[in-house]
C-alpha cells in the first residue's frame, strides 16, 4: 500500500505506485483538469512521475506561486521548438525560467531581428494550439550524446558529457521535437496558454565565458493570464520612463563611459544627492552608537589568504604588484575591520562594538554584467560590523532591524520583506552554535515586527543571514539590506576579547548593511521617485525665476536669503518667457519655483509654484523662506511631534 498525505490532512491509500495525475483524477474532474504538476515531499515533479512509497503530496495548479516558474520554463521550451521549426540548423543551448520571464540562448549564423521575434511568437501560439503532450524520457548517456551529435547539437552533447555520472539523462518530448532537460514540465503545450510575449534580443557567451562563442539570447515573459501580462507590460513601460540612466542624464546627475567601465562619473547635482544621503546615514549610525573607521583600499594577499577570500573570491579581485608583493583592491571591508578590533586588548565591557565604514570597494565584474548604477565595479558600501557576544545577537539584531526600518521609511520605502536563510549543508561551526544563531535571528525579527519567509539552506557557510527586500513605487522588489552572523572570520583572523571570567573568547561578528551600496541604492531611489526626490534630498531645491529683467536684483536678494537658510537654490535670470522656464525646470524635477516680477519686487513677496502643481501661492518672502527651510530639514533632524 502507498499512503498519500494531502494538504487538507486527509490520507488516500493506493494498492501500488500512483501518479499525481491519478491522484488528481481520484479527487475530482475539476482538479484533474487544473493540475499542472505535483510536489512529492516538497519536491516538484511531473504529474506522470510514479509515487512508490508513502509521501506528502500537493497538486500544483495555476493559482499556486510555484506554477509560475513551471509556466515560464515551458515557455522557453516552446520558444526553442518554434525557433527550430522556423530556422532549421539553429542550435539550442540553455533556456531557464528567470524572474518575470524566461530566455533561451541560440547558436545561429544569421542574427535574429525584431521581425523574427514576431514570427517566433506566432509559431509559439500555433504550438500551444496543437496541445502536444510533454513526455519525459530517460536515455542512456552514450545514446543521448550520439543523438544530439548527429543532429549537430554540439552544445547539448557537451552538456550531457558534463553531467554527473549518477544523474539520469532526461529528455522531454513535445510531439516530434525534444530537448535535454531535468524538468519538471507541464502535461502539454496547451497548458501554457497564450499570455506570453517575446521581449528583446541580446548577446551571451556560452557558459558566460568571454573565451567561448557568442550566442543569441531571446528574452520573453509569461503569465497565467492576459490581465497579469498586461499589468507587467504596463509596469515595464513605466520602468522605462523611470530608468535611472535616462533620468540621470536628463537631470545631469551622473554619466558612465567606456574608459572607466563600471565606475561612475558623478556630476555636481548627483554628488550633492550622494553626499546628502551619506551624511544622513552618518548621523543615523552615530546616533545608534556606531564608530566610523576608514581602512586601506590596497591590502596584501596574505590577509585575504587568511580570511579565505583569496581562495573563494580571487577572480573578482583587482590585483596589483608592488615590490614583489601582490596587493588586492579590497572587495569588502570585513577583514580590515577585524584588524582594527585586534589593536589593543578588548574586554567584554567593550562589546558590542559597532564599527562602520563607508568603504570604497572594487570587484572585477564581467563587462556584460555591468548595468548603470545597479551593477558596477567601483562602489561604496554603507558597511558595518558588530562585534558582540552570543548573548547579544538578539538585542543587536533587533536594534539593527529597527534602525533599518526607520531608514527605509525616511527614504520612502514602507513595504519590506525579509528572507531568512538558514544553515547550508556545507558549513562551519557546531549544530549547537547554528541552533543558537538561527533562534536568535528569528526572535529578533519577530520582536522587530518583521515577517519573514524561509530560504532553506541558503545561509553563508559561516552563519545564517537575513536579506531585506524593498518594494518600489511600481511594484518591483529590490534586495538591499543584509545581516549575517559570522562565527568563522573572527576565528580565522584571531580576534578575541577577555570575558568576565578572565579568559579569552571569540566575538561573534554581525555583518550588516542597510542601503547595500550607495551607487545601487541611488539607482533604486532615482527609479522609485522617478527623479522627483523628496525636498530634503533634491539636488536643487528651489529655482528663483524672473518674469522680467526688472526683477533681477530682487531675485538675487531672494536667492541670497534662501542660501542663508541652507537651501540649495539657483536663480534663472534668462531673458525667456516664464512658461518656458517653468517647463524647463519641471523637466529637471526641481521641487519648487519662486516666480518674481515687478509686482513681487515692489511688495517683497514671491509666487511659490510646486512641481506638478497647476497653481501658485503668493507669499511674503519671509513666510516662503520659513516654510521651505522647515521642509528642507532631513527626517532624522526634524523635531518629534508633540502629544
Swiss-Prot record:
It is an enzyme of class 6 (ligase). GO terms for biological process: threonyl-tRNA aminoacylation. Its main location: cytoplasm. It comes from Rhodospirillum rubrum (strain ATCC 11170 / ATH 1.1.1 / DSM 467 / LMG 4362 / NCIMB 8255 / S1). Its EC number is 6.1.1.3. Its cofactor is Zn(2+). This is Threonine--tRNA ligase. Catalyzes the attachment of threonine to tRNA(Thr) in a two-step reaction: L-threonine is first activated by ATP to form Thr-AMP and then transferred to the acceptor end of tRNA(Thr). Also edits incorrectly charged L-seryl-tRNA(Thr). It is found in: Cytoplasm. It catalyses: tRNA(Thr) + L-threonine + ATP = L-threonyl-tRNA(Thr) + AMP + diphosphate + H(+). Homodimer.
Amino acid at each position: 500500500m502507498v499512503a498519500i498525505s494531502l494538504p487538507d490532512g486527509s490520507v488516500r491509500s493506493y494498492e501500488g505506485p500512483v501518479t499525481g495525475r491519478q491522484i488528481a483524477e481520484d479527487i475530482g474532474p475539476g482538479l484533474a483538469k487544473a493540475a499542472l504538476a505535483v510536489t512529492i515531499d516538497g519536491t516538484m515533479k511531473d504529474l506522470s512521475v510514479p509515487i512508490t512509497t508513502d509521501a506528502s503530496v500537493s497538486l500544483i495548479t495555476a493559482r499556486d506561486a510555484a506554477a509560475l516558474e513551471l509556466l515560464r520554463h515551458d515557455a522557453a521550451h516552446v520558444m526553442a521548438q518554434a525557433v527550430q521549426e522556423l530556422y532549421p540548423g539553429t542550435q539550442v543551448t540553455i533556456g531557464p525560467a528567470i524572474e518575470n520571464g524566461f530566455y533561451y540562448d541560440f547558436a545561429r549564423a544569421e542574427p535574429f531581428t525584431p521581425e523574427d521575434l514576431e514570427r517566433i511568437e506566432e509559431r509559439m501560439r500555433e504550438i500551444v494550439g496543437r496541445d502536444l503532450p510533454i513526455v519525459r524520457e530517460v536515455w542512456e548517456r552514450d545514446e543521448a550524446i550520439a543523438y544530439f551529435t548527429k543532429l549537430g547539437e554540439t552544445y547539448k552533447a557537451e552538456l550531457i558529457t558534463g553531467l554527473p555520472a549518477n544523474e539520469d539523462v532526461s529528455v522531454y518530448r513535445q510531439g516530434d521535437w525534444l530537448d535535454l532537460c531535468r524538468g519538471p514540465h507541464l502535461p502539454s503545450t496547451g497548458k501554457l496558454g497564450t499570455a506570453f510575449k517575446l521581449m528583446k534580443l541580446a548577446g551571451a557567451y556560452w557558459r558566460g565565458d568571454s573565451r567561448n562563442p557568442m550566442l543569441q539570447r531571446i528574452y520573453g515573459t509569461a503569465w497565467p493570464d492576459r490581465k497579469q501580462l498586461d499589468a507587467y507590460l504596463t509596469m515595464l513601460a513605466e520602468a522605462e520612463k523611470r530608468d535611472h540612466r535616462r533620468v540621470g542624464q536628463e537631470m545631469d546627475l551622473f554619466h558612465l563611459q567606456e574608459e572607466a567601465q563600471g565606475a561612475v562619473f558623478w556630476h555636481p547635482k548627483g554628488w550633492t544627492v550622494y553626499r546628502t544621503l551619506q551624511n544622513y546615514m552618518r548621523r543615523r549610525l552615530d546616533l545608534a552608537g556606531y564608530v566610523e573607521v576608514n581602512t586601506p583600499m590596497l591590502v596584501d594577499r596574505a590577509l585575504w589568504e587568511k580570511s579565505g577570500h583569496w581562495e573563494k573570491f580571487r577572480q573578482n579581485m583587482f590585483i596589483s604588484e608592488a615590490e614583489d608583493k601582490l596587493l588586492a583592491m579590497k572587495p569588502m571591508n570585513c577583514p580590515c575591520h577585524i584588524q582594527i578590533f585586534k589593536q589593543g586588548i578588548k574586554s567584554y565591557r567593550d562589546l558590542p562594538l559597532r564599527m562602520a565604514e563607508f568603504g570604497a570597494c572594487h570587484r572585477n565584474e564581467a563587462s556584460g554584467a555591468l548595468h548603470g548604477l545597479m551593477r558596477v565595479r567601483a562602489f561604496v558600501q554603507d558597511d558595518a560590523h558588530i562585534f558582540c557576544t552570543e548573548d547579544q545577537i538578539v538585542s543587536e539584531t533587533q536594534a539593527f532591524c529597527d534602525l533599518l526600518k526607520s531608514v527605509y521609511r525616511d527614504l520612502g520605502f514602507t513595504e519590506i520583506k525579509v528572507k531568512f536563510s538558514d544553515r547550508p549543508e556545507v558549513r562551519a561551526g557546531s549544530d549547537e552554535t547554528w541552533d543558537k544563531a538561527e533562534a536568535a535571528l528569528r526572535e529578533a525579527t519577530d520582536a522587530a515586527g518583521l515577517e519573514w519567509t524561509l530560504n532553506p539552506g541558503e545561509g553563508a557557510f559561516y552563519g545564517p543571514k537575513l536579506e531585506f527586500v524593498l518594494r518600489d513605487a511600481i511594484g518591483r522588489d529590490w534586495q538591499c539590506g543584509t545581516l549575517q552572523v559570522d562565527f568563522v572570520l573572527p576565528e580565522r583572523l584571531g580576534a578575541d576579547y577577555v570575558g568576565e571570567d578572565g579568559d579569552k573568547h571569540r566575538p561573534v561578528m554581525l555583518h550588516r548593511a542597510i542601503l547595500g551600496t550607495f551607487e545601487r541604492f541611488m539607482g533604486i531611489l532615482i527609479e522609485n521617485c522617478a527623479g522627483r526626490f523628496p525636498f530634503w534630498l533634491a539636488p536643487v531645491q528651489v529655482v528663483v525665476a524672473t518674469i522680467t529683467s526688472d526683477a533681477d536684483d530682487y531675485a538675487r536678494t531672494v536667492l541670497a536669503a534662501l542660501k542663508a537658510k541652507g537651501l540649495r537654490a539657483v536663480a534663472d535670470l534668462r531673458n525667456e518667457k516664464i512658461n518656458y522656464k517653468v517647463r524647463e525646470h519641471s523637466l529637471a524635477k526641481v521641487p519648487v519655483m519662486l516666480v518674481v516680477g515687478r509686482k513681487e519686487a515692489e511688495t517683497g513677496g514671491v509666487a511659490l509654484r510646486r512641481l506638478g502643481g497647476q497653481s501658485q501661492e503668493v507669499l511674503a518672502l519671509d513666510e516662503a523662506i520659513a516654510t521651505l527651510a522647515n521642509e528642507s530639514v532631513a527626517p532624522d533632524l526634524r523635531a518629534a511631534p508633540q502629544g
